[in-house]
Amino acid sequence: ALWKDMLSGIGKLAGQAALGAVKTLV
């Protein structure tokens, strides 16, 4: 379960980073 939480956290951070990059580019 721990690795699932880690993957979930990484996914959220990656999603936020992607959104931030898109907003910056646009």
Swiss-Prot record:
Subcellular location: Secreted
Alphabetically ordered keywords of this record: Amidation, Amphibian defense peptide, Antibiotic, Antimicrobial, Secreted
GO cellular component terms, A-Z: extracellular region
Main subcellular location: secreted
GO BP, sorted A to Z: defense response to bacterium
One Pfam family of this chain: DD_K
UniProt modified residues of type Valine amide: V26
Tissue specificity: Expressed by the skin glands.
Family to which the UniProt record says this protein belongs: Belongs to the frog skin active peptide (FSAP) family. Dermaseptin subfamily.
Task of the protein: Has antimicrobial activity.
Protein name listed in UniProt: Dermaseptin-J4
Organism: Phasmahyla jandaia
